[in-house]
Amino acid sequence: MKKQRNLRSMAAQAVEQVVEQGQSLSNILPPLQQKVSDKDKALLQELCFGVLRTLSQLDWLINKLMARPMTGKQRTVHYLIMVGLYQLLYTRIPPHAALAETVEGAVAIKRPQLKGLINGVLRQFQRQQDELLAEFNASDARYLHPSWLLKRLQKAYPEQWQSIVEANNQRPPMWLRVNRTHHSRDSWLALLDEAGMKGFPHADYPDAVQLETPAPVHALPGFEEGWVTVQDASAQGCMTWLAPQNGEHILDLCAAPGGKTTHILEVAPEAQVLAVDIDEQRLSRVYDNLKRLGMKATVKQGDGRYPSQWCGEQQFDRILLDAPCSATGVIRRHPDIKWLRRDRDIPELAQLQSEILDAIWPHLKSGGTLVYATCSVLPEENSLQIKAFLQRTADAELCETGTPEQPGKQNLPGAEEGDGFFYAKLIKK
């Protein structure tokens, strides 16, 4: 039996690591969840994701409720109060229980002398809640985004930025990809129905299913057998443009965690696929996905800027470049992105993308297809990136995705329930 732990203090420390130390929640959370019971795992995840999603609101409220901020070794208490406020605002946890557990969290973080302070701040919020929220809802903080990102979205999407922000602040739907080598989508939906769950097919992407209610993967029919994979609909859209064929040599660059590698092999089981990623740790997930789906591909660790180091002079029929990016299209799935990214990251990422494009283009055969994809919504990483590449690359031609003046296809977050995603299909003349 697992030791009873204070979930509020665990959530506070996790959020502090994201905001103060720049760590990714996807790295921090799984080890913490191993320390708690199954029933507490979901609540711990809800507290971490929820606080990060609404961080600017919770920060704003604390600044109104406290005369001075908590600093130094007491900084964790700031995040513990955030966890308390989040419960009072956004969960069905009875207020008395939320207060008691949050106050008790001070003991777990070795700050028992501050129990009275935490209790006082949360009770003050309860008394002033209506007037505080009215003031908050009249401020720019209500958009729950850092100001630098808000400015970029307003500039890029003067008509749509509010709907993008709204979508980013929602909980994401759960999308699945049915493995067509095992089942048709309709036959798998029938199995889902038999299991007491409901799903809906995507209108454009032939393997995509949206669950009516998110479910643990072990509850999905045939998950362990490789019949189905968790993957957002927009990410599945890459195959529409790549159109892999049996017998071709295909490069999946920046491949981890392997969702698109395995999708290529579902569409073209006889393709020769090379999956490359710079992050050796994340490559283990590519191996895991290939094993679960019973597929084979060549997997290598390598830097996309130096392809000769990992493929020599080899050329490919098709290349999928899922470029490193700001991930501003998947904020609803990873709310920590809002607080991990900085404005200065964008030109640095655009430069990296440009270098990878230039380096990998010679490794595409004449007549071959390169699909450039990102999970970003920022033009510097997307349409402007491809426009500049077309201008400096004489044998590159845009195909089916946009115009030379406005190249690529941009999916915005929440459109058809998918994530924000960009695709550009390029043909080598």
From Swiss-Prot:
Enzyme Commission no: 2.1.1.176
Keywords of the record: Cytoplasm, Methyltransferase, RNA-binding, rRNA processing, S-adenosyl-L-methionine, Transferase
Compartmental location: Cytoplasm
Residues bound to S-adenosyl-L-methionine: 254-260, 277, 303, 322
GO molecular function, one term: RNA binding
Catalytic activity: cytidine(967) in 16S rRNA + S-adenosyl-L-methionine = 5-methylcytidine(967) in 16S rRNA + S-adenosyl-L-homocysteine + H(+)
Pfam family of the protein (one): NusB
Active site: 375
Disulphides: none
Keyword Methyltransferase attributed: yes
GO BP term, example: regulation of DNA-templated transcription
InterPro entries referenced in this protein's UniProt entry, alphabetically: MeTrfase_RsmB-F_NOP2_cat, MeTrfase_RsmB-F_NOP2_dom, NusB-like_sf, NusB_RsmB_TIM44, RCMT, rRNA_ssu_MeTfrase_B, rRNA_ssu_MeTfrase_B_ent, RsmB-like_ferredoxin
Protein role: Specifically methylates the cytosine at position 967 (m5C967) of 16S rRNA.
Family named by the database record: Belongs to the class I-like SAM-binding methyltransferase superfamily. RsmB/NOP family.
Name of the protein in question: Ribosomal RNA small subunit methyltransferase B
Protein species of origin: Escherichia coli O7:K1 (strain IAI39 / ExPEC)
